[in-house]
C-alpha cells in the first residue's frame, strides 16, 4: 500500500535508493508504474452502494443511540447554565436567554454550555461509529472497496466513511457549536433557545440515507470555514 511504496520513512523506495542509488530507484519507480498500469487495465477498481451499507443490527443500534441522544438536551442545558435539581421549561429558557445575553461579556458561560453538550454527545457519536464501522458493514475489509481505499492510503479517510455510513456528528466553528442569532435561534426553523442537540449543530444524519436541510446548512458552515 501507500506506506510501503509511498514517500514515507523506511518505505521500499527510500531503502532501495540507499542501497543501490538514485538511478536504480528511478528505474524501480518506472517499473512499478508500468506494472500497476497494466494491472488496473485488467483488474478495474471501483466502489458501489454495497460498500457503504450496514447490517440491520447496526442500524437498530444506531437508531437506539439516536433516540437516547435526542432526550439529553434539557439536562445538558440545565447543567451548562448552573441549574440543579428540578426545573421547568420556562425557567430553563430564561436561564438560557440570560446566558446568551451575557455571553459577549462573559464568554465562559457559553463555553461551559458547549462543553456540557459535547461531553454528553461524544459518547453517542462513538457508540454509533463502533456499531457501524467496521464490524457493522455488510461487506467487510478487504472485500469492501471503500475500506480498502482508506486503509491503503489511496484516497479518503476514516472521517469520510463515518459521515457516509454512520453520522456527521457535532459541527463546530472555531472549536465552538454554531452560534445563535439575536433572536435566540441557531436557524430560523428552530425555536428560540431550543435545547435539542440538532438545534446546536449535532447531526445524527448520514450521507447514505440523506440529511435534513438544517443539517446540510450547518455542514456547509463548517465546510466554508475549513
What are these model-derived regions, one by one?
Residues 1-101, 111, 147-150, 154-226:
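Feature marking long nucleic-acid-engaging regions of large polymerase/nuclease enzymes
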Amino acid at each position: 500500500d501507500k506506506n510501503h511504496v509511498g514517500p514515507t520513512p523506511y518505505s521500499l523506495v527510500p531503502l532501495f535508493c540507499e542501497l543501490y542509488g538514485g538511478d536504480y530507484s528511478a528505474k524501480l519507480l518506472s517499473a512499478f508504474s508500468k506494472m500497476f498500469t497494466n494491472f488496473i487495465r485488467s483488474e478495474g477498481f471501483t466502489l458501489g452502494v454495497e460498500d457503504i451499507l450496514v447490517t440491520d443490527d447496526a442500524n437498530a443500534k444506531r437508531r437506539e443511540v439516536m433516540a437516547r441522544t435526542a432526550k439529553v438536551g434539557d439536562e445538558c442545558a440545565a447543567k451548562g447554565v448552573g441549574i440543579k435539581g428540578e426545573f421547568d421549561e420556562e425557567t430553563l429558557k430564561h436561564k438560557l436567554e440570560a446566558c446568551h445575553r451575557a455571553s459577549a461579556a462573559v464568554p465562559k458561560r457559553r463555553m461551559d454550555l458547549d462543553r456540557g453538550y459535547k461531553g454528553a454527545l461524544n459518547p453517542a457519536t462513538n457508540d454509533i461509529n463502533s456499531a457501524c464501522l467496521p464490524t457493522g458493514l455488510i461487506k467487510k475489509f478487504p472485500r469492501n472497496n471503500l475500506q480498502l481505499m482508506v486503509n491503503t492510503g489511496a484516497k479518503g479517510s476514516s472521517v469520510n466513511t463515518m459521515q457516509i455510513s454512520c453520522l456527521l456528528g457535532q459541527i463546530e466553528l472555531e472549536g465552538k457549536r454554531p452560534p445563535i442569532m439575536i433572536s435566540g435561534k441557531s436557524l430560523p426553523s428552530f425555536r428560540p433557545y431550543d435545547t435539542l442537540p440538532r438545534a446546536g449543530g449535532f447531526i445524527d444524519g448520514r450521507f447514505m440515507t440523506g440529511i435534513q436541510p438544517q443539517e446540510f446548512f450547518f455542514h456547509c458552515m463548517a465546510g466554508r470555514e475549513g
